[in-house]
Swiss-Prot record:
It comes from Homo sapiens (Human). This is Ubiquinol-cytochrome-c reductase complex assembly factor 3. GO terms for cellular component: cytosol; mitochondrial inner membrane; mitochondrion; nucleoplasm. The gene is UQCC3. It is linked to Mitochondrial complex III deficiency, nuclear type 9: A form of mitochondrial complex III deficiency, a disorder of the mitochondrial respiratory chain resulting in a highly variable phenotype depending on which tissues are affected. MC3DN9 clinical features include feeding difficulties, hypoglycemia, severe lactic acidosis, and delayed psychomotor development. It is found in: Mitochondrion inner membrane. PANTHER family: UBIQUINOL-CYTOCHROME-C REDUCTASE COMPLEX ASSEMBLY FACTOR 3. Belongs to the UQCC3 family. The keyword Ligase does not apply. The chain crosses the membrane at residues 8-28. Residues 29-93 are mitochondrial intermembrane. Required for the assembly of the ubiquinol-cytochrome c reductase complex (mitochondrial respiratory chain complex III or cytochrome b-c1 complex), mediating cytochrome b recruitment and probably stabilization within the complex. Thereby, plays an important role in ATP production by mitochondria. Cardiolipin-binding protein, it may also control the cardiolipin composition of mitochondria membranes and their morphology. One of its GO terms (biological process) is cristae formation. Coiled coil: none annotated.
């Protein structure tokens, strides 16, 4: 009988803890309107940020394409955005 009582108390405590956790989750979760506002404030939502990210992606792709077509080690360049001699004096190690 004592073990049944302990088991019921344990189940009740676990249930109460789960209930409190769920209640806290409901309280701190933003509503639908707040979710929409947060989505609008995200970094890549404005056109300028999207254009900058697209330009960065284009530069990266161009650098990778150039690295694939040349024997020069582009990692030695001081400025990856331009061609020419790098930190190794134009020679590949």
């Amino acid at each position: 009988m004592d073990s049944l009582r302990k088991m019921l108390i344990s189940v009740a405590m676990l249930g109460a803890g789960a209930g409190v956790g769920y209640a806290l989750l409901v309280i701190v979760t933003p509503g639908e309107r707040r979710k929409q506002e947060m989505l609008k404030e995200m970094p890549l939502q404005d056109p300028r940020s999207r254009e900058e990210a697209a330009r960065t992606q284009q530069l990266l792709l161009a650098t990778l394409q150039e690295a694939a077509t040349t024997q020069e080690n582009v990692a030695w360049r001081k400025n990856w955005m331009v061609g020419g001699e790098g930190g190794a004096g134009g020679r590949s190690p």
